[in-house]
Amino acid sequence: MTDQPRRRLVLASQSPARLNLLRQAGLDPEVIVSGFDEDRLSAPTPAELALALAEAKASVVAAKPEVQGALVIGCDSVLDLDGEALGKPADAEEATARWKAMRGRAGTLQTGHCIYDTASKRYASATASTVVRFGEPTDEEIAAYVASGEPLHVAGAFTLDGRSAPFIEGIDGDHGNVIGISLPTVRRLLGELGVGITQLWTPREK
């Protein structure tokens, strides 16, 4: 019996962190950015917004002729702080205000995941949630962090795998979800589509 050919995998995101996590898990997707305007969507809750954005991004890329037959992964993350959905801050002033509001508190990082199987025209989607407990950086530390430019490029104005890591006391839930993609969630969604994640592994170098 011959092995089935490995399915083509496409990541509908320009996030280097998401791509890196998938590669660490043995997956090597192509990157095709959706270009979807996130301001076009609204939702009653941050979790629903994250899911709607993930589904929209996956569906936009899945509709492209060049990806037919592929599995397309779309993700989007927002921070739920007091029921408000916080994505990437618009500017340094907003990033500073966010950090002053977040310090010493906890928020929930919501990441929507959608996997679209362009071969079967089916999709599976879910939101993963991780509680993030923020430390209490000083005003000077916040100013230095904002000046680094990093918080302007990430949902919630922070990331676990960057310069804000010392300002995060801990998390409750999936570490990868906070970085941008929950690998256990990806595995479950692939399973719903009848695809085993091990079938997508790239061969190990000898």
Swiss-Prot record:
Coiled coil: none annotated. Its main location: cytoplasm. One of its GO terms (molecular function) is nucleoside triphosphate diphosphatase activity. Transmembrane segments: none annotated. SUPFAM superfamilies: ITPase-like. Its EC number is 3.6.1.9. It catalyses: a ribonucleoside 5'-triphosphate + H2O = a ribonucleoside 5'-phosphate + diphosphate + H(+); a 2'-deoxyribonucleoside 5'-triphosphate + H2O = a 2'-deoxyribonucleoside 5'-phosphate + diphosphate + H(+). Keywords: Cytoplasm, Hydrolase, Nucleotide metabolism. Gene3D superfamilies: 3.90.950.10. It is found in: Cytoplasm. It is an enzyme of class 3 (hydrolase). One of its GO terms (biological process) is nucleotide metabolic process. The active site is at D76 (proton acceptor). The keyword Cytoplasm applies. Its cofactor is a divalent metal cation. It comes from the Bacteria. GO terms for cellular component: cytoplasm. InterPro entries: ITPase-like_fam, Maf-like. PANTHER family: BIFUNCTIONAL DTTP/UTP PYROPHOSPHATASE/METHYLTRANSFERASE PROTEIN-RELATED (PTHR43213), BIFUNCTIONAL DTTP_UTP PYROPHOSPHATASE_METHYLTRANSFERASE PROTEIN-RELATED (PTHR43213:SF5). Nucleoside triphosphate pyrophosphatase. May have a dual role in cell division arrest and in preventing the incorporation of modified nucleotides into cellular nucleic acids. Belongs to the Maf family. This is Nucleoside triphosphate pyrophosphatase. It comes from Streptomyces avermitilis (strain ATCC 31267 / DSM 46492 / JCM 5070 / NBRC 14893 / NCIMB 12804 / NRRL 8165 / MA-4680).
